[in-house]
């Protein structure tokens, strides 16, 4: 009887701790959202005001317009990321579990990123075999799209991104490896935090929403998958995702 009560007390304490941690994360997230949304809005507002008041030379108009466009796109990307993370946090994603072929999904993502990879002059290759898992296609797509997009964005001209899909003892494995700029060791433990960005000196001043890899982390957790990251500065990054053992008849 005492053991049962003690166990119940421990469960209650654990739940209280989880609630407090979740509340602290929400507060931190809200503060970060306010700051991160304000930054591109300030740039857009400032540049637009200068253009409205006729203080921009005609030859500078394309540069100002491009900056406004880029910041607006970043703002849209950030808002979309916030919505996706909120849905994952609150389990409000429509749970259409189905058999998903990760090999075919990789080709879909490659096609969707064709324009981006051509602009960055980065080749995307897909290797491996057809491998199916039970999962939510929408979330799996977001996971691997964000990984691949980052691998293209933070790469070199003439670089490569390689998707490898395999299965070992009925454990589906997806590896995304790039020849990009790499991640400093001191940043590896934090890259999946919301709004965390690697030092600009290492990322060629490229801007992102800071939410892509956080979506990856949440998506992996949603599917009970394990994730490993290996990276070497100046040589590239390798992200490995290992899904739970699947039924052999998938």
Give each language-model segment a name.
Residues 52-59:
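Short acidic helix/loop segment immediately C-terminal to the autophosphorylated histidine
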Residues 116-125:
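Short conserved segments within the C-terminal catalytic ATPase subdomain
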